[in-house]
Amino acid sequence: MEKYMSLLTRIEEMMQSTSYQEGDRLPSIRQLSARYQVSKSTVIRALQELEKRHLIYSVPKSGYYIVKKSGKSKSGQPGPIDFATSAPDPDVFPYLDFQHCINKAIDTYKNDLFIYGTPKGLPSLIRVLRKLLATQQVFADERHIFITSGVQQALSLLCAMPFPNGKEKIAIEQPGYHLMVEQLETLGIPAIGVKRTEEGLDIAKVERLFQTESIKFFYTMPRFHNPLGCSLSERDKQELVRLAEAYDVYLVEDDYLGDLEENKKADPLYAYDLSSHVIYLKSFSKMMFPGLRVGAAVLPEALTDTFYAYKKLNDIDCSMISQAALEIYLKSGMYGRHKEKIRDSYKERSLRLHQAIRTHRQLGSGRFTFSSGQAPCMHTHLVLPQDLPASRVIHRLEKQGVLLEAIDRHYLSDYPKENLLKINISNVKTEDIERGVKLLMSHL
């Protein structure tokens, strides 16, 4: 990495510290040069780059100042506390870095980005993804990696296409990813719910299901489950893979937040798969921004031809500009730095939430079950007593400016719903979490 880029990153970290506010003046060029032991020309280049990214602005004969963000409340009144939205925080979107990558992609690939690509994806991006996946214990040949328009497209194709096992039903965790639930029910695909809790899965029940039902694949989120926020134990993962091989059931592993994992011993299901029964899905939308509709699917050899045929019918290619920009973003190291920033942000919010719940639960009856779960994670949940419906709590808190969302849409329509209150922290400012939790606890 060039010196000025290293310095740029350190200045950004300094700007994000609690001692600096928007509109504050940065240390002088001379002071920055002395502090970081670099030349003045390196400091100037780093500051100029930050200015290009609209993070700072210069005042002649005065210095550089931190840009004030637009969209702040001018009334000084606190806005709603949004524990409902699961999209990533817009304040941490890497807009400017990715804009640079888009411009660089156009300069590099020129006309190639504006003609039809290939259904499989941009070959240079696939090569970069193969290396990235290998760092996460997903060792795959390039011919098994497909670029899709997000995980949602991959799921749609997998639901539609026939599998080598000749089976028809799809098993899905309950509660589970709401858009997958919606897809199964809208398309009338036979689906069977599998209970998922903080403790994981009942492996004995999963085995009976695989034995007695015609299960095409089991869709699961082993890490950072949406909406529960918990992860499967390594033992459960190994047992799932064993059962998949024994009963010829495929596992569709949605690892949408795998980049948040801090435990180096926590591997994806794919790492345990020796019989080619795991389909691995990766997304960038929750780590970067929802509008980046680029995902990856890693498929066993037996599925690649069929997936390719269905993908080609579904669309000619995923956005070539987005693919090329993502390739540059990954190769440049920007994604690695952004990932650390996101991980730190969610970890701080998760820990603040867990601490606030423990501290303030006595404000109400305290009749709920809560596991502190994992940090960092966007999601967590409370198990409420049956005489306190989650819908009632949500309605009362909405009147006080605290937004929560019912969990019903995470269940199949014929599956018994539990009285759970899901909580997302991705769009709640750290300083608002305690106030929101106090209001929540007072209604429980």
Curated annotation (Swiss-Prot):
PANTHER family in the record: HTH-TYPE TRANSCRIPTIONAL REGULATORY PROTEIN GABR
N6-(pyridoxal phosphate)lysine PTM positions: K286
Family the UniProt entry places it in: In the C-terminal section; belongs to the class-I pyridoxal-phosphate-dependent aminotransferase family.
Protein name: Uncharacterized HTH-type transcriptional regulator YcxD
Gene: ycxD
Cystine connections: none
UniProt keyword terms in alphabetical order: Aminotransferase, DNA-binding, Pyridoxal phosphate, Transcription, Transcription regulation, Transferase
Record-annotated DNA-binding residue ranges: 29-48
MF terms in GO: DNA binding; DNA-binding transcription factor activity; pyridoxal phosphate binding; transaminase activity
InterPro entries per record: Aminotransferase_I/II_large (IPR004839), HTH_trans_reg/aminotransferase (IPR051446), PyrdxlP-dep_Trfase (IPR015424), PyrdxlP-dep_Trfase_major (IPR015421), Tscrpt_reg_HTH_GntR (IPR000524), WH-like_DNA-bd_sf (IPR036388), WH_DNA-bd_sf (IPR036390)
Entry-linked Gene3D superfamilies: Type I PLP-dependent aspartate aminotransferase-like (Major domain), Winged helix-like DNA-binding domain superfamily/Winged helix DNA-binding domain
Cofactors: pyridoxal 5'-phosphate
GO terms under biological process: alpha-amino acid metabolic process; biosynthetic process
HTH gntR-type domain ranges (all copies): 1-69
